[in-house]
Amino acid sequence: MQHWKDFVSWADHLSQGKHRAYISMHSFSQMLISSYAVSYNEFPHEPFSIDQMNEAGKVITDAMTAVHGFKYEYGQSREILYPSAGTSKDYALEVFRIPLSWTWELRDTGKYGFILPPQHIVPNFEEVLAGMKALVGFINENYET
């Protein structure tokens, strides 16, 4: 974790505190999971940027789903997946104030699990690329650069 903190700190310094998005890529579930991951009992308030994460999440998942028809969902981890503690997205949001902080869970929804067949790799990349383009468009439209 220390190396990750050092890297994000260095990147934050280079960007002069203007990071807009943080993404931790994982498989599998086809979800964009935003902060917070911790349970409502432990952390009852909402993230400062929850409205922006939800708005961007819809734009991004719509773009990803449109590529090949594989449905992507978005929402807070504690609502659409399960509560968890110590996630990098929560740390990026709270410590570095990066407003759009997610875990992107890529293909699939369980049939293949973590062993995605080779024929799904390029289509999955195409979905991620569409999502990244949608994210950049959202940032350009909604944030000062």
Task: Say what each PLM segment does.
Residues M1-T145:
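Metallocarboxypeptidase
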